[in-house]
């Protein structure tokens, strides 16, 4: 995983009932709820600091809500194709084999190996190696996929040890 820090403006939408004396708290909560630990366009905000030293730009009324661009210092994380990651093998059935690596989900394609059921548990076989469901494996990221909520998603292949 790689990361970088940038200054930017994050747009958030506030409802009329949120425009009270607690507006700073409501803005902070809206920024965190909308952007923190959410995968958007291949990157995820891991840390957000709202800049108090910069004036807040005027809001814009859109569909009975107020859109505010909030000045922030944002630390983003992202993954590259070719990165090598380590995680837990999760086999739900023959067609759903993934590796869970914290904020990253690696999907294994059918041609990555074969799944069999033995001794009341699933096993994944690749190049003569057997990997039990729940075992720690290493994988190389092959292709980025559409992320889900708070996780990156990549197609990956297991690296034989």
Curated annotation (Swiss-Prot):
Keyword Transferase: yes
Keyword annotations of the record: DNA-directed RNA polymerase, Early protein, Nucleotidyltransferase, Transcription, Transferase, Virion
Protein's recorded name: DNA-directed RNA polymerase 18 kDa subunit
Induction per the UniProt record: Expressed in the early phase of the viral replicative cycle.
One GO molecular-function entry: DNA-directed RNA polymerase activity
Principal place of residence: virion
One of the Pfam families matching this protein, by short name: Pox_RNA_pol
């Amino acid at each position: 995983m790689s990361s970088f820090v940038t200054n930017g403006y994050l747009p958030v939408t506030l409802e009329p009932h949120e425009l009270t004396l607690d507006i700073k708290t409501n803005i902070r909560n809206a920024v965190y709820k909308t952007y923190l630990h959410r995968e958007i366009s291949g990157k995820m905000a891991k840390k957000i600091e709202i800049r108090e030293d910069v004036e807040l730009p005027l809001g814009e009324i859109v569909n009975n809500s107020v859109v505010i661009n909030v000045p922030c210092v944002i630390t983003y994380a992202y993954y590259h194709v070719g990165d090598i990651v380590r995680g837990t093998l999760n086999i739900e059935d023959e067609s759903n084999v993934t590796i869970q690596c914290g904020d990253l989900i690696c999907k294994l394609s059918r041609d990555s190996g074969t799944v069999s059921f033995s001794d009341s548990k699933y096993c994944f076989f690749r190049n003569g190696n057997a990997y039990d469901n729940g075992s720690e494996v290493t994988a190389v990221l092959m292709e980025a996929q559409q992320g889900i909520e708070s996780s990156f998603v990549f197609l990956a292949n297991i690296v034989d040890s």
